[in-house]
Amino acid sequence: MENLLPLCVCALSLALLVVLGCAEKRRNEANRKKLRVAVNVNGIRGKSTATRLITAILAEAGYRVVGKTTGTAARMIFWDAEDEQEVVRRPHGISISEQIQVINSAVKRGADALVCECMAVRPDYQRVYQHQIINAGLTVITNVLEDHLDEMGPTTDQIAWAFADTIPYNGAVVIPDCEYTEYFKSVAEERGTRVFVADDSLISEEYLKQFDYRLFPHNCSVALAAANALGIDRETALSAMLKAHADPGALRFYDISLPKGDCCIVNAFAANEPSSSLDIWNIVCSERPEQSANPIILMNCRPDRVDRTKQFVRDFFPKIPNAVIIAAGESTGNITKAEAHGRFPNADRYINLEKQSPEKVLETLKPLLPGRIVMCVGNIHGSGEPILHALLEYGRLPLPEPIFRERRKSRH
């Protein structure tokens, strides 16, 4: 009889967990039904920006909308408050169950619309996130690029399959104009879902210049297509997007005046894969031809993002002419080996500053800065943000608030 006691306890505990899980599922479903609109923003790059822009559009259209970004600088954005709320995570870190609490808090606040950046990476988690938790009527796929290949890959085909699995049934989907457009359309047709293709040609350079931070046409065309899917007119959408605030870590150019020649710091950490980084590089070359003639490319590496480092080695560094390539952070070995094997023939030189302090990185950079662009790529996590702050302090520029404590300024 004594031997049965532990088994009984385990069985009762398991039964209790099942009961609690079922109860939570029912509560979440009941809360979800109270929302008129739910949007799931998926993709590789630009999800946080799209979430902010779509949230602003819904607010302008009169919805009581809550937006939620995820990742490094997770934030809750409210239609009725000027301050954003930092998402404080439990010790175990990011979990898709966090989304249940987001839906609950949005409903308690009186929201009738919710826009959420997809926080799941693994394909099976993405499926659960969309079809069992948020059940969004509109999915937005910003792009399909190489990243998170260890969890979603090994190729972009698998990434596209994962994103397609989050297309709703009998709803709407916004998709990019890319090699997977027809595939996404076919999945949407099977599910009885309307398709809206983002059209970058609808966004002019003149419009983008009205923002006080840098955006690509695609950032806005995705949000504009979402507005169309939601039945919100173009004029309302364009006006609303201008009121959305930048995500922490958004692309910005910082000019520093130096006695021997001005330099420009480009914070491109958020574009943490080669394709988006090359898009930014093309903007840099177009706007700053003299400073970009002999650039400094500063990459912050992470030990848990070695695949990302390999992607930069293969697809980014060889395409930047006359660059001083500086590797900082941890696990810089792939860059060091590639340089030793002559894989960066167009580079000026390579400097390995692995595990060096931000102060040491700054001291190394100082004599190289005059007349140059410093483009910061790779990862903001780890040494990235402290190095950026060290550079801005050296240039006597006001520091952006740390990404974990970003506050919104008034819209009025």
Indicate where each model-derived feature is located.
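ATP-dependent carboxylate-amine ligase catalytic core
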Residues: 29-35, 56-139, 143-156, 160
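Hydrophobic alpha-helical packing residues
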Residues: 54-59, 188, 339-340, 391
